[in-house]
């Protein structure tokens, strides 16, 4: 006889698989594979080597996803049979438990593959923070978010490198960019881009009044050297300045820091962590490429959302999450509507559930 806890676990796994089915439309994926296979059969397909490799990899990834999905369907069929047999044969209970463990592991693996299957999802991430208007209040909020993301990275055993750090006038930060290195760092963080809002009793207000602060987050993938993104040198304004801020003995105090402004978009990238001006410029150009890619990525997603009539709530330029610390505690994602009252845990880096909800939500728009 199957124990109650096992039955609950079976029901949960079935529910999880149904959720995955809603996101992973196998008919649509199989149709996409047919289109890619047809394209790969064209006589001129390999004329553009980079594009051909990208399409071949995409087709293979989709085929692997289909195989994994069908194997999971077979596993659930085996589970149903084992559960039925266990009603008359108690020795089959062990078989049910064994199949359950296999399914649990496969669902976790498939979910990760499905949700993190876009180009560059497996890349390292650059994460930039900028406070909104409001001086010290917003600058302090930006530093709280920086702490939240570094705590999250530590919990996931990711490496963290400070690329640029500009201290606030009284507290907090004027801006900061960090590099988070590890498996799927960009894929997990990419939907954290946007405006984050804080409501609290200000520690900087002698009258103890409630304040609202804003800070924006930008997340970009780190590209390898052969990714081609055209940048016209005439579109760049390059300034040098003296390094400073966090970093101690590892920050070069000469005029080696570099600030690059991309004139057509107004994007500004500052780097001060490398040992020479040449190295800082190279890193700044790499981050600029990543920001230009992310800008295009956001435009494409906004267009998909606009076609579904949802851009008002989910626009990249709008507020994405609110953190209320007074008069009650609540952190709420305004796109997925996922929320928790444990605001302190979130600010201590416990954001995995928010990230998973984001990935599931945006998977519908792939």
Swiss-Prot record:
<dbReference type="GO" id="GO:0005737">
    <property type="term" value="C:cytoplasm"/>
</dbReference>
<keyword id="KW-0963">Cytoplasm</keyword>
<dbReference type="Pfam" id="PF00472">
    <property type="entry name" value="RF-1"/>
</dbReference>
<keyword id="KW-0488">Methylation</keyword>
<dbReference type="InterPro" id="IPR045853">
    <property type="entry name" value="Pep_chain_release_fac_I_sf"/>
</dbReference>
<protein>
    <recommendedName>
        <fullName>Peptide chain release factor 2</fullName>
    </recommendedName>
</protein>
<feature type="modified residue" description="N5-methylglutamine">
    <location>
        <position position="249"/>
    </location>
</feature>
<comment type="function">
    <text>Peptide chain release factor 2 directs the termination of translation in response to the peptide chain termination codons UGA and UAA.</text>
</comment>
<comment type="similarity">
    <text>Belongs to the prokaryotic/mitochondrial release factor family.</text>
</comment>
<keyword id="KW-0648">Protein biosynthesis</keyword>
<dbReference type="GO" id="GO:0016149">
    <property type="term" value="F:translation release factor activity, codon specific"/>
</dbReference>
<dbReference type="InterPro" id="IPR004374">
    <property type="entry name" value="PrfB"/>
</dbReference>
<dbReference type="InterPro" id="IPR000352">
    <property type="entry name" value="Pep_chain_release_fac_I"/>
</dbReference>
<dbReference type="InterPro" id="IPR005139">
    <property type="entry name" value="PCRF"/>
</dbReference>
<dbReference type="Pfam" id="PF03462">
    <property type="entry name" value="PCRF"/>
</dbReference>
């Amino acid at each position: 006889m199957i124990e109650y806890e096992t039955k609950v676990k079976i029901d949960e796994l079935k529910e999880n698989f149904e959720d995955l089915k809603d996101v992973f439309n196998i008919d649509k994926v199989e149709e996409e594979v047919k289109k890619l296979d047809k394209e790969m059969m064209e006589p001129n397909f390999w004329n553009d080597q980079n594009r051909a490799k990208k399409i071949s990899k995409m087709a293979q990834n989709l085929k692997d996803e289909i195989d994994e999905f069908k194997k999971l369907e077979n596993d659930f069929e085996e589970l149903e049979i084992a559960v039925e047999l266990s009603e008359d044969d108690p020795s089959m209970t062990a078989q049910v438990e064994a199949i359950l463990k296999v399914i649990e592991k496969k669902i976790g693996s498939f979910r990760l593959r499905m949700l993190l299957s876009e180009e560059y999802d497996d890349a390292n991430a650059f994460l930039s923070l900028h406070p909104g208007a409001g001086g010290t209040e917003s600058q302090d909020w930006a530093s709280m978010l920086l702490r939240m993301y570094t705590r999250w990275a530590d919990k996931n055993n990711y490496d963290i490198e400070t690329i640029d750090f500009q201290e606030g006038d009284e507290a907090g930060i004027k801006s900061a960019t960090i590099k988070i290195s590890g498996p799927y760092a960009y894929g997990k963080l990419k939907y954290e881009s946007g405006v984050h809002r804080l409501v609290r009793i200000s520690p900087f207000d002698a009258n103890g009044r409630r304040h609202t602060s804003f800070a924006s987050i930008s997340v970009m993938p780190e590209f390898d050297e052969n990714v081609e993104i055209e940048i016209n040198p005439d579109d760049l304004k390059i300034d040098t300045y003296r390094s400073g801020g966090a970093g101690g003995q590892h920050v070069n105090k000469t005029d080696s820091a570099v600030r690059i402004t991309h004139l057509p978009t107004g994007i500004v990238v500052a780097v001060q962590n490398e040992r020479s001006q040449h190295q800082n410029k190279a890193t700044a150009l790499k981050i600029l490429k990543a920001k230009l890619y992310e800008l295009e990525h956001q435009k494409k997603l906004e267009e998909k959302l606009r076609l579904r009539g949802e851009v008002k709530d989910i626009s990249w330029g709008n507020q994405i999450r609110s953190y209320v610390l007074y008069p009650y505690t609540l952190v709420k994602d305004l796109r997925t509507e996922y929320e928790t009252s444990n605001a302190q845990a979130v600010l201590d880096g416990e954001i995995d559930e928010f990230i998973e909800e984001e990935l599931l939500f945006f998977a519908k728009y792939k």
